[in-house]
Amino acid sequence: MKDNQQAVQLQQPTTIGHYLAVRLAQAGVKHHFVVPGDYNLGLLDKLQYNNYLEEVNCANELNCAFAAEGYARANGIAACVVTYSVGAFTAFDGIGGAYAEDLPVILISGSPNTNDIGSSHLLHHTLGTHDFSYQYEMAKKITCAAVSIQRPTEAPRLIDYAIKMALLKKKPVYIEVPTNVASQPCAAPGPASLITEPETSNQEYLQMAVDISAKIVNGKQKPVLLAGPKLRSFKAESAFLELANSLNCSVAVMPNAKSFFPESHPNYAGIYWGQASTLGAESIINWSDCIICAGTTFTDYSSNGWTSLPPKANVLHVDVDRVTVSDAEFGGVLLRDFLHELAKKVKANNASVVEYKRIRPESLEIPMENPKAALNRKEIIRQVQNLVNQETTLFVDTGDSWFGGMRITLPEKARFEIEMQWGHIGWSVPSAFGYAIGAPKRNVVVFVGDGSFQETVQEVSQMVRLNLPIIMFLINNRGYTIEVEIHDGPYNRIKNWDYAAIVEAFNAGEGHAKGFRVGNGHELAEAIRQAKENSQGPTLIECNIDQDDCSKELINWGHNVGAANGKPPAKE
């Protein structure tokens, strides 16, 4: 924000809506995603008065929440505004995803007039009861802070608290604003530092954790580093790279941390994902006697159905606010601070690098298929690899797109986005939309399956509306392939669509979206060429492949996850 005080002065006299707008801008929000509804219309008017905020309309509340989630990936924080119950209930899905993925999204919901609280009135958009607190109570379960403004005098304190918690905890928060409250006067905002003051480490515990950890690491034969998904949200990527350079050991990354460490780095050892690992990463982790796990989270998905977990005895675990080493835990130690300080005390040890060079595959290049042969996944990956550059951000949706994305080698500064913890199919389309608004200079490319696309296709219309040149590769194999591999059944077959035609239908005579259907390598290459030239709107390339064409990694992963899901109850 150019001048926080200027933004405050622009809002005189201050109302609650104006106050919220100023605080959003001070927190770093430049765009807010909205679906209008009668309980939030007055608030939307107030937000529009702020010159530092731009309103972005969404097609529905699920997409609105996911668009804000994607914006938070690019911008560091996001906000979305919906109406009561019929809007917020739908948005809760995406907010749950933001919580799972450590993304600070501020969910703002209008709500009934305060005069109706405690009255005998039954209102629309409610459950048909006289208790209107249920949405606030629900929001508390999926946010790190939830506030409901019932008295204008409380608004500044409650708004500040919620936004500050979002920034500190990197989790979503909820702010409920009754329809008659947004225009009520309140105190003017104070300094931005009241909400943006960063958290700091406990210096005593930090030093103790670093000293003990350095002694242990320096006494080991083959230390390695493992990058986890929390590095990005908690701004620890640079500190992690600093430690990697100081220790000079092999570095593997979890699948949901791809691009958080440069793949061009000489010590990069690939993706650690059990039998779905790349470049021999599983071996280098399993052979290590000291694994520094930085910002890692192990779930059934990221551990390949619990089949790939680092040996606990060899793990030094660095979480976002604590370090666990040799059965000792040091709280109040921030991830970034610990990595930065540890880098000063470790000794270089390239034993794991020397060992890794002996097992690293010589080449990952995929041979070119006959241009006229039926299209397959390998040829799609080969051609997308040539499309990716340092300005690219690659989104991979839940499904076989994950495994295809892992095979893409990222040049330095390229980014990779995945939603592995929440795992909502269709997430990538609205999230990429929000990301493109937050990072307009990035080239956004999406891998999405046909079943996933059917969940959230409406947001393509907003890409058309805002002339966003997002390129989407829709892998059409006529079904939910990821679920087929976990547990097959007739419910995994879906109705085929003419996806290319649907995308162009969103133009309605005035947009610039393009849709292509391709069935071989030659057609795919031509579609990519035209997609690169289309700078005024989205391009969807429908890649038709055989229904049985899926990666062997997905088959293995699906088997392991299915086995974990099907484990019988413990005997009493």
UniProtKB/Swiss-Prot annotation:
Residue ranges that the Swiss-Prot or TrEMBL entry lists as coiled coil: none
GO cellular component, one term: cytosol
Region (Thiamine pyrophosphate binding): 400-482
Cofactor(s) for this UniProt protein: a metal cation; thiamine diphosphate
UniProt xrefs under Pfam families: TPP_enzyme_C, TPP_enzyme_M, TPP_enzyme_N
Annotated positions binding substrate: 38, 125, 483
Cofactor note: Binds 1 metal ion per subunit.
SUPFAM superfamilies membership: DHS-like NAD/FAD-binding domain, Thiamin diphosphate-binding fold (THDP-binding)
EC number assigned by the record: 4.1.1.1
One biological process term in Gene Ontology: fermentation
Binding site for Mg(2+): 450, 477, 479
Gene3D superfamilies in the record: 3.40.50.970, TPP-binding domain (3.40.50.1220)
Reactions it catalyzes: a 2-oxocarboxylate + H(+) = an aldehyde + CO2
GO molecular function, one term: thiamine pyrophosphate binding
Keyword Lyase: yes
Keywords tagged on the record: Decarboxylase, Lyase, Magnesium, Metal-binding, Thiamine pyrophosphate
InterPro entries registered for this protein in UniProt: DHS-like_NAD/FAD-binding_dom, PDC/IPDC-like, THDP-binding, Thiamin_PyroP_enz_cen_dom, Thiamin_PyroP_enz_TPP-bd_dom, TPP-bd_CS, TPP_enzyme_TPP-bd, TPP_PDC_IPDC
Family that this chain belongs to: Belongs to the TPP enzyme family.
Assembly behavior: Homotetramer.
Protein known as: Probable pyruvate decarboxylase C186.09
Organism: Schizosaccharomyces pombe (strain 972 / ATCC 24843) (Fission yeast)
